[in-house]
């Protein structure tokens, strides 16, 4: 294991490359206490981090109890390290710098991904706002459907009225009178009721028939008149007196 402590930016370069200001010298040549420096490095590193071990530039390297120690300074910046061999220490320092650089590089793309999420959220928002437009366009379709249904009903009513008019023109009476004729005589123009004396397609009583029949058919049973004459008389009575003249109406 090798521990390297760098006290300044300039010292980082010195620690990694192994180049230091001043001449390399053994601790005994610099007049330093190896045991004291080794003990400080192992048990009290804060004191070594606070200030250089001596004034001026120095480059002190020694081995104490099978552990290498290195103390360097260019007169302004300083560093120190210890471990099992300087080669291993240099490798450890280089690996640490590389790991830090890789970690910073790996963290940067994660920060870049955040705007993409924001853009995605912005893209989704217009899709939600489009929903009311769909509802607005559906309403005219419903109105158009209602209008179409109303038009169909009106058309059916017109067709029904036209059909009734056609029937009325072909038989001489309206649809209601046709129903009355079916109930009164089954449509038989010669039908006669012996008990009441009513006769004809619409079962006219004699007095009623005389009030609406042409002069040449008055005083005669309605059953003796042609169907067209009976129809005209029935329609006249219906228009002037209403359907209440027939019990079966």
From Swiss-Prot:
Keyword tRNA processing: no
Signal peptide: 1-27
CDD domains referenced in this protein's UniProt entry, alphabetically: RPF (cd13925)
EC number: 3.2.-.-
Ranges of Low complexity composition bias in the record: 80-95, 103-171
Entry keyword set: Glycosidase, Hydrolase, Secreted, Signal
Pfam families named among the record's database cross-references: Transglycosylas
Biased composition (Polar residues): 172-182, 192-203
GO molecular function, a single term: hydrolase activity, acting on glycosyl bonds
UniProt region (Disordered), positions on chain: 80-203
UniProt family annotation: Belongs to the transglycosylase family. SceD subfamily.
Function: Is able to cleave peptidoglycan and affects clumping and separation of bacterial cells.
Name of the protein this chain belongs to: Probable transglycosylase SceD 2
């Amino acid at each position: 294991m090798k521990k390297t402590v760098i006290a300044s930016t300039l010292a980082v370069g010195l620690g990694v490359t192994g180049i230091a200001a001043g001449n390399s010298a053994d601790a005994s040549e610099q007049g330093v206490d190896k045991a004291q420096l080794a003990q400080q490095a192992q048990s009290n590193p804060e004191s070594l981090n606070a200030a250089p071990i001596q004034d001026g530039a120095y480059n002190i390297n020694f081995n104490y109890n099978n552990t290498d120690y290195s103390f360097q300074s260019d007169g302004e910046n300083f560093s120190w390290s210890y471990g099992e061999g300087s080669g291993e220490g240099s490798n450890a320092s280089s690996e640490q710098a590389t790991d830090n650089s890789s970690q910073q590089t790996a963290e940067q793309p994660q920060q870049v991904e955040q705007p993409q999420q924001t853009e995605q959220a912005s893209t989704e928002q217009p899709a939600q706002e489009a929903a009311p437009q769909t509802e607005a366009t559906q309403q005219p379709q419903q109105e158009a459907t209602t209008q179409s249904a109303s038009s169909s009903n009106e058309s059916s009513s017109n067709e029904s009225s036209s059909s009734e008019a056609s029937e009325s023109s072909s038989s001489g009476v309206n649809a209601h009178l046709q129903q009355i004729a079916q109930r009164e005589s089954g449509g038989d123009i010669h039908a006669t009721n012996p008990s009441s004396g009513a006769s004809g397609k619409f079962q006219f009583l004699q007095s009623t028939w005389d009030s609406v029949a042409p002069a040449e058919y008055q005083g005669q049973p309605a059953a003796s008149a042609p169907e067209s004459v009976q129809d005209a008389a029935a329609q006249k009575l219906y228009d002037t007196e209403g359907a209440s003249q027939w019990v079966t109406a």
